[in-house]
Amino acid sequence: MGPEELLTKSGVSRETLERLRLYADLLVKWQARINLVGPDTVPDLWSRHMLDSVQLFPLIKVGARRLVDLGSGAGFPGLVLAVMGAPDVHLVESDSRKCAFLREVARVTETPVTVINKRIEQVAPLGADVVTARALAPLDRLLGWAFPHLAEGGECLFLKGRGAEDELTASAKEWNITASRVPSLTDPGGLVLHLREVSRGRAQP
């Protein structure tokens, strides 16, 4: 899959596509120096990383004013969503080299973001309307990291693989959530977990 197919599948504008091309070019260049993504995924960058991130954009709640992406790494999905126009995006990443990459992509693509070079646990509550994450941790741990950053009525969009249902079951021991399951556009067995009404404490039978 290439950029033109992304255009067909997602409906992004030509302007956004060109900015994503710049992003992809920078990733390939930086990948030679630091391990931003799995080396075997680079040839399939537009599907494995770009489209995987782009698919979250229509799920962002109407009226959202701030998005926080946890464990941003190479910027998937948070920086891609910022390029597409998501509001007031904060990228949390502990690796300073990856933060340098995120800032360079933001500069070159003229995308306003806030890059936070800290461990998630060290970041003060950010009051996010939407929290995103991909391939970061099991759901119960991920909710523990995300919850302090959720504003009232905030939602989570988590990209998950084939174990998503098991993770939902395990998280129910500690968390109350309303979960929608959206089939992944890039992983036949994967899901986007759209979580609302998140609160700590086992639900009453």
Swiss-Prot record:
S-adenosyl-L-methionine binds at G71, F76, I120, E121, R134. It catalyses: guanosine(527) in 16S rRNA + S-adenosyl-L-methionine = N(7)-methylguanosine(527) in 16S rRNA + S-adenosyl-L-homocysteine. It holds the Pfam family GidB. The keyword Iron-sulfur does not apply. PANTHER family: S-ADENOSYL-L-METHIONINE-DEPENDENT METHYLTRANSFERASES SUPERFAMILY PROTEIN. Belongs to the methyltransferase superfamily. RNA methyltransferase RsmG family. This is Ribosomal RNA small subunit methyltransferase G. The lineage of its organism: Bacteria, Pseudomonadati, Pseudomonadota, Alphaproteobacteria, Rhodospirillales.
